[in-house]
Regions:
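Short, intrinsically disordered, low-complexity terminal/loop segments
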Residues: 1-4, 181
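Bacterial N-terminal signal peptides that target proteins for export
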Residues: 3-20
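C-terminal motif of bacterial Sec signal peptides marking the signal peptidase cleavage site
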Residues: 27-30
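Primary mode marks residue(s) on the alpha4-beta5-alpha5 output face of response regulator receiver
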Residues: 32-181
Length: 181
């Protein structure tokens, strides 16, 4: 039996191992840099009309946001404006350290889908979630189904809530409450 320190590999095996090793490192680098490149750390990291996904940051009361595709199945928000003051009615916002600017956001609702929506000013962006229509909302939130959407002139039924956004372009959603919140 050969001494393990002197076992020789065929040249092709060493080249293949090197190629596989480089490929793994490339994929890892691409994945980590892609996520970092999409992190939102200031309002100007997102263009008006782009979407962001918001999640809780390490179990704390702060949130993290990343740019994402607007057509994802996850709950996303559309950046509507960067404001130094208040955002519009129904708009939510993100604040950032070292700036007074706010990134104003509109929920990116899809017709026919149900969402958990916070009902009080103490709610968080992470409380907005896609949810089963028969689901149970967290305390302080309600479940709403998006019946229809369109420009600001859309008419909603009397028993529906009309959420209207003016920026980046007129958009309105007709929502039916499915819970007692």
């Amino acid at each position: 039996m050969a001494d393990p320190g002197t076992v020789k590999c065929a040249r092709g095996v060493r080249v293949s191992a090197a190629v596989v090793g480089c490929a793994v490192l490339f994929v890892l680098a691409a994945c980590s840099s892609g996520r970092g490149a999409n992190n939102v750390s200031e309002p100007s990291d997102v263009a008006v009309g782009e979407c962001v996904e918001v999640r809780e940051a390490d179990g704390s009361s702060t949130v993290e946001a990343t740019r994402t595709d607007c057509d994802t199945d996850e709950m996303t928000f559309v950046a509507t404006q960067i404001a130094t003051g208040e955002c519009g009615d129904y708009e939510n916002y993100l604040t950032f350290p070292d700036t007074k600017d706010r990134l104003c956001l509109m929920p990116n609702y899809a017709d026919g889908q149900c969402y958990q929506i916070p009902q009080s000013s103490g709610g968080s962006l992470v409380d907005f979630t896609n949810i089963e229509c028969e689901g149970t909302p967290v305390t302080g939130a309600g479940i709403y189904r998006v019946e229809s959407s369109g420009d600001g002139s859309i008419e909603c039924a009397a028993d529906q809530v009309k959420a209207t956004y003016d920026k980046p372009e007129a958009r309105a959603f007709c929502l039916t409450s499915l819970s007692d919140a």
